[in-house]
């Protein structure tokens, strides 16, 4: 398996084993994209709900309590099929704490299977859709492959862009340039 970017090692541990099993089942059933969509929906709920994060991370809840609570949430959210069964199985096996990593590992496996390279892009403020497409096109030219962008807004960059793709990183942020100038000025004294 590819060790692509910072998510590569996820495919080696518990998260990777669960994600690989889910991916293989989804592939065999022709449901890879449906499962990804449902996992993304659950991941969005997870990021938005402090109560769900507490349920997932806390060892104080029994497997039965976690399974029941997650089952009710999945029903309300309309998450069903293989993804729902996978999430419930994770709860029943006391592996719910690893679910965020399992979801990331599943995404990585899907990208790998489709030949898509992941790029983490940090900018100071949200760019327009046209700028995002220009960034994607530039990264596609470099990677010689389709690129999936994870966009992060980081006002501390002041301006510019930081791109991490695989083991390569380009920092063209204004913050880094100002720090370089500051360092050069200190050395010139």
UniProtKB/Swiss-Prot annotation:
- Provide the topology term for how it sits in the membrane: Peripheral membrane protein
Q: Name one Pfam family in it.
A: OSCP
Main location, first listed in the record: membrane
Q: List the molecular function annotations (GO) for this entry.
A: proton-transporting ATP synthase activity, rotational mechanism
SUPFAM superfamilies for this protein: N-terminal domain of the delta subunit of the F1F0-ATP synthase
**Mind listing the UniProt keywords for this protein, alphabetically?**
ATP synthesis, Cell inner membrane, Cell membrane, CF(1), Hydrogen ion transport, Ion transport, Membrane, Transport
Q: Which PROSITE patterns match?
A: ATPASE_DELTA (PS00389)
This entry carries the following GO cellular component terms, namely: plasma membrane; proton-transporting ATP synthase complex
Where does the record say this protein resides? Cell inner membrane
What does the sequence similarity comment in the record state about its family? Belongs to the ATPase delta chain family.
Role: F(1)F(0) ATP synthase produces ATP from ADP in the presence of a proton or sodium gradient. F-type ATPases consist of two structural domains, F(1) containing the extramembraneous catalytic core and F(0) containing the membrane proton channel, linked together by a central stalk and a peripheral stalk. During catalysis, ATP synthesis in the catalytic domain of F(1) is coupled via a rotary mechanism of the central stalk subunits to proton translocation.
Quaternary structure annotation from Swiss-Prot or TrEMBL: F-type ATPases have 2 components, F(1) - the catalytic core - and F(0) - the membrane proton channel. F(1) has five subunits: alpha(3), beta(3), gamma(1), delta(1), epsilon(1). F(0) has three main subunits: a(1), b(2) and c(10-14). The alpha and beta chains form an alternating ring which encloses part of the gamma chain. F(1) is attached to F(0) by a central stalk formed by the gamma and epsilon chains, while a peripheral stalk is formed by the delta and b chains.
Name of the molecule in the record = ATP synthase subunit delta
Tell me what gene encodes this: atpH
